Amino acid sequence: MKEEKYMKKTAAVLAAAAALTMSVYASPQTEFTKGQWEINAGMWNTKAKTRTYKDNSAWNFNGGVTYGLTDKAAAQFQYYGLNSDDTDGRSHELNLLYSVHPQVAVYTGYNHITMSDFPIGVFGAEKRENDIAQLGIIARQPINEVLDLYAKGALGSKNTSIWEAGVNFALDENIDLNAGYRYLNTEGSRNKNVSYQGWLAGVSYRFGGGSDGKAVYSENDIDYSALENKGHKKEESMV
């Protein structure tokens, strides 16, 4: 009887570990594989707002590509449209990411933000461009075998801050669906910032990097709590 319980417990933990192995590569990535590519694309329903001006939202394309330089670092290009109902804009990011934990990555990079078609009285000009140096962090928390919560945040020059949080659903080990809310705030003039915010959703696809997909962390580095509890419940129902 004891051997049977031990085998059930071992099977539950192994199943959890296998599921998390798939989960750690979920988008947005906090762990990388050398030579692996990730392509992501989606839509962002964003609106523009300043202290004295507010515009209705419009749907924008967002997308990017990430490439694993090593098993700990990656290079990334990311694009976000910043069009609202009456204004135009876009954001181009170039980032270097580094995994400090299977569920946490930090990054630094350059962000070029263009804002145009604002009424002249808002910024004193119709068009504004910001060149931004930024530092950020990405964190994820597995909920079960296929569902993660994620959060991203960055601070940069020109009084810039970027925040995003949402959920990620893994269709398989290479394809994810995600949805969340994104907020971008940056300098429009010396005494007036502009913010872009709204709901977004997208899909990501990973390929390349070999077939082993081995992580460079030990099992002790990974938070198994959400998956272990599920395994224990299954064990109790079987006894």
Model regions: which residues?
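Gram-negative bacterial Sec-dependent N-terminal signal peptides
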Residues: K2-P28
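Outer-membrane beta-barrel translocator/channel fold
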Residues: T46, T50, N83-G89, T108-I132, ...
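Outer-membrane beta-barrel "beta-signal"
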Residues: Y98, L135, F169, S195-V239
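Hydrophobic, lipid-facing positions within transmembrane beta-strands of outer-membrane proteins
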Residues: W59-G63, R90-L94, A133-I137, S161-A165, ...
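Gram-negative (and chloroplast) outer-membrane scaffold detector with strong preference
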Residues: K72-K152, S157
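Short glycine/proline- and aromatic-enriched beta-strand/turn motifs that initiate or cap beta-hairpins
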Residues: Y25-N83, A133, P142
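Repeated loop/turn-to-beta-strand initiation elements of outer-membrane beta-barrel proteins
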Residues: W37-I39, D71-F77, P102-T108, I143-L149, ...
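Residue-level signature of outer-membrane beta-barrel architecture
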Residues: Y67, Y98, A139-Q141, L155, ...
